[in-house]
UniProtKB/Swiss-Prot annotation:
Keyword tags: Glycoprotein, Phosphoprotein, Protease inhibitor, Secreted, Serine protease inhibitor, Signal
One Gene Ontology cellular component: extracellular space
Protein name: Alpha-1-antiproteinase
Role summary: Inhibitor of serine proteases. The primary target is elastase, but also has a moderate affinity for plasmin and thrombin.
Modified residues (Phosphoserine): S33, S378
GO biological process: response to cytokine; response to peptide hormone
Domain remarks: The reactive center loop (RCL) extends out from the body of the protein and directs binding to the target protease. The protease cleaves the serpin at the reactive site within the RCL, establishing a covalent linkage between the serpin reactive site and the active site of the protease. The resulting inactive serpin-protease complex is highly stable.
Keyword Glycoprotein listed: yes
Organism encoding this protein: Mus saxicola
Signal peptide (UniProt feature, chain positions): 1-24
A molecular-function term among this protein's GO annotations: serine-type endopeptidase inhibitor activity
Region named RCL: 368-387
Entries under PROSITE patterns matching the protein: SERPIN
One of the Pfam families matching this protein, by short name: Serpin
């Protein structure tokens, strides 16, 4: 008989931030030509790419008039870690919802590729600050399954903290301090409140700080119009740059594509749709196209006008993950018996994701030939990012999508 007591688990999936960084005058570029070509890394990048754009389209479906910003790799890491302690249909839903084909990839291999990915992302880089972290907050009288703890530490580099959830304010502060420290103070007060029967919390964060290889000159930034929609226009600081840049027009997406590298191993891909083509861009964009853009680069003289911006995203993942098939972990049928040795069932009561982004002149702070067409003109192309656009930030060694976003209104944080 199922016990009448039900304990709750809080998942803080992907608390992430991107923040701008001042340019270092004496920084030398790192050789990023040696991409991580291992099959595991390629599979992970493909799965995360599919997951990223599935999640993006669901966010657009929920609201196509708001800024969007999230970290697919951070959300996926949190749920993959949770799957370590799940069983049966609960585990299957999580892993298939993350776009893994369980007939081709074993559970053990999935956790190994996450381990490899996290080791790659946390690799020291003097030019690019990129770090991730996982924290397990366990009620001090709750006994966890030793195998779950060992694998969480081994595969996901998790830290474990003993917490008295009966003192909810102290527990909330401990979780918030962990996130605030991991994001270097950019995300504070991540947890607003805790359910009274919470006994376990999992927090994942990602922090990214990058400097543009080709920075904007602040002296060239001017006030300009940004057209939110046909009836709304806002004034924004518009950064201006004319250089040799990776710019081309993609007829498949009816969009201009701008790729801007960071010092280190990351690239931002900005997609500016033609008038009236945003919906077409969002329905057509996929991981394969992003990969082709990164492999078929076309540097040419171009002039760009790009808004200085600071946006954020905060999401209830329970509603967001349901269309991807991840539902059982949130209800009373959840099987998370691989986490705790206690008899009372555990279920995920709340899963939240928060991300913040700043792009300015210095950089970002928080994160087939027939398809890609290069347009050659006698005059350099001029790109005005003065209406809604889509972007992704990719770790170039693995082509992992770190962040995905949409700017509808740069003035709305």
């Amino acid at each position: 008989m199922t016990p009448s007591i039900s304990w709750r688990l809080l998942l803080l999936a992907g608390l992430c931030c991107l923040v701008p960084s001042y340019l270092a005058e004496d920084v030398q570029e790192t050789d990023t030509s040696q991409k991580d070509q291992s099959p595991a890394s390629h599979e992970m990048a493909t799965n995360l790419g599919d997951f990223a754009f599935s999640l993006y389209r669901e966010l657009v479906h929920q609201s196509n008039t708001s800024n969007i910003f999230f970290s697919p790799v951070s959300i996926a890491t949190a749920f993959a870690l949770l799957s370590l302690g799940s069983k049966g249909d609960t585990q299957t839903q999580i892993l298939e919802g993350l776009q893994f084909n369980l007939t081709q990839t074993s559970e053990a291999d999935i956790h190994k590729v996450f381990q490899h990915l996290l080791q790659t992302l946390n690799r020291p880089d003097s030019e690019l600050q990129l770090s991730t972290g996982n924290g397990l907050f366990v009620n001090n009288d709750l006994k966890l399954v030793e195998k779950f703890l060992e694998e969480a530490k081994n595969h996901y580099q998790s830290e474990v903290f003993s917490v008295n959830f009966a003192k909810s304010e102290e527990a909330r502060k401990m979780i918030n301090d962990f996130v605030e420290k991991g994001t270097q103070g950019k995300i504070v007060d991540a947890v607003k409140d805790l359910d009274e029967d919470t006994v376990f919390a999992l927090a994942n964060y990602i922090f990214f700080q990058g400097k543009w290889k080709t920075p904007f000159d602040p002296e060239h930034t001017t006030e300009a119009d940004f057209h939110v929609n046909e009836s709304t226009t806002v004034r924004v600081p518009m950064m201006n740059l004319m250089r040799m840049l990776d710019v081309h027009y993609c007829s498949t997406l009816s969009s201009w594509v701008l790729m801007m590298d960071y010092l280190g191993n990351a690239t931002a891909v900005f997609l500016l749709p033609d008038d009236g083509k945003m919906q077409h861009l969002e329905q057509t964009l996929n991981k394969e196209l992003i990969s082709k853009f990164l492999l078929n680069r076309h540097r040419s003289l171009a002039e760009i006008h790009f808004p200085r911006l600071s946006i954020s995203g905060s999401y209830n993942l329970k509603a967001l993950m349901a269309p991807l098939g991840i539902t059982r972990v949130f209800n009373n049928g959840a099987d998370l018996s691989g986490i705790t040795e206690e008899n009372a069932p555990l279920r995920l009561s709340k899963a939240v994701h928060k991300a913040v982004l700043t792009i300015d002149e210095r950089g970002t702070e928080a994160a087939a030939t027939t398809i890609v067409e290069a347009v050659f003109m006698s005059l350099p192309p001029i790109l005005h990012f003065n209406h809604p656009f889509v972007f992704t930030i990719v770790e170039t060694h693995t082509q992992t999508p770190l962040f995905v976003g949409k700017v509808v209104d740069p003035t709305r944080k």
